[in-house]
Amino acid sequence: MRSLRWPLAGVFGSLAMVIWSFEMPPPLAQILSDRMLSITPGALFGFLIDKLQLVGKPLFFLGTVGLEVVAGVVAALLLVPLARLRPPALLAAGAALGAVLAALARALLGGEAGAPSVVAGFLIYGVVTAAAGLLLGAALGEEASGRYGQPAQGRRRFLGMAAAAIGGVLAAGAALEIGRTLRGLGEHGSAAPAGPLEISDLVDLGEVADTHPGVVRGLPPASLTPALTPNRDFYVISKNFLDPVVDARSWSLRIQGPLVADPVTLSYEQLRALPSRSEYVTLECISNDVGGHLMSTARWTGVPLRDLLRHAGMRDAARWVAFTCADGYVESLPLEQALEPTTLVVYLMNGEPLPSKHGFPARIITTGRYGMKNPKWLRTIEPVQAPVEGFWEKQGWSTEALVKTTSRIDLPTEHQRVTPDLTFGGVAFAGTRGIKRVELSTDGGATWLPAELERPLSPYTWTLWYLTRQARRGSQVSALVRATDGTGAVQTAASTASYPAGSTGYDARRFSVD
């Protein structure tokens, strides 16, 4: 048992440090995960996204936490030669080890690894590991039988140390709970608008329902994907393992750089006071697989980006517009795209302030490009002469990120048992090109049947489609779907993965007819 003292110390010290680190801004595990993710080869990352989808990032993060624990065991073993030191000296040695780890992290990781909270975290990491070694040493009898004299005195000392340890754990738990509560309040507070919402800010759901019901005629309302996605159901993809929480009271948006004559700084209230417009826009993640659900539609309200650029006096030399965000994310758009009236700096989503996970207090929304080109938690806007290589581009993903034509079968669901009166339905999307036709095949693509199309909410959203036909009882039905965009180009049948420019191919479903 005595030989396990320091490895166990490393395990317990590491776990304590990992738990405590989640209350630091930013947590060490997040920095390590972000850094490791940024150096992961793009092809491997794309493969993992295709195969693991939404569970990939949590698994990656848990792996990083596991590495922290292993590092704690290694650190504890490094302290073994110092095991005979008195407690104050041992704790000092632990702090010294933490300082060495902090310096190594700064050299290897750079950036946020030099933040005071992280440096302090490494120092505490070493101290906690050393302290855990002392406690476990006493528990295993080494301290009780030797350094502290009589066994009874050793036991009393151990009980006192154990009580202190338990108290420390309880205090840490209480602090963690308080931190979570404060964080939750921060998220709630930051998601609230700077002032009361005006009636004109709200989506008129009745008007939306009148102009486009969002369900196929003659079908139950729950049968198809709604034309407008509720905020709670809107897909979420982020490079971060823990997203930033931004306080609207201290936030500002800056239009800056050498290519503007009059730099502008706007508060949240000032941004919301500017003339605005609303657009229905569908966003799709570039990592969305064929038939995947990383695609949603919302009504976005904000200030046209071109108005802000003109207000700042953008110079003629500008060719691109770059964005930086609260989480360190950078992205850029070609100038012609930035000047489109539909490219917005938005602050409302479906009539509500942007949820924190969707970029509160402001984000970019543009049309015809994958979600990576719509940065969240916006902080600065800067006209530039060349494109900025963003997070995804550095991993080999497409710089243009133009949406490809896609179509999806939502009804019936895969392997569902259906009646002979068979109804198919789903969505099709082609960015700014629109959808001209959707077709369904039940004979492997030999023949195609035209589907009925619902009128889209705007030229920039998906189109709902449906088709009814008779099927023979007891049969197995295999269905394929394809779409034709507004230019007349038919969706490609060639199947490709999402990396590096978006997936292609036909969505397919198989059903049993009762």
Where are the model-predicted features located?
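N-terminal signal-anchor transmembrane alpha helix
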Residues: L4-P25
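Structured, non-membrane catalytic/scaffold regions adjacent to prosthetic-group chemistry
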Residues: E23-P26, V69, E112, I178-D514
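Extracytosolic (periplasmic/ER-lumenal) interhelical loops and adjacent juxtamembrane/interface segments
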Residues: A29-L52
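Hydrophobic alpha-helical transmembrane segments
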Residues: K57-V80
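N-terminal secretory signal peptides
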Residues: A76, V80-Q153
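Juxtamembrane/interface segments at transmembrane-helix termini
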Residues: L135, A139-A144, A174-G189
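N-terminal secretory signal peptides and thylakoid transit peptides that target proteins
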Residues: Y148-I166
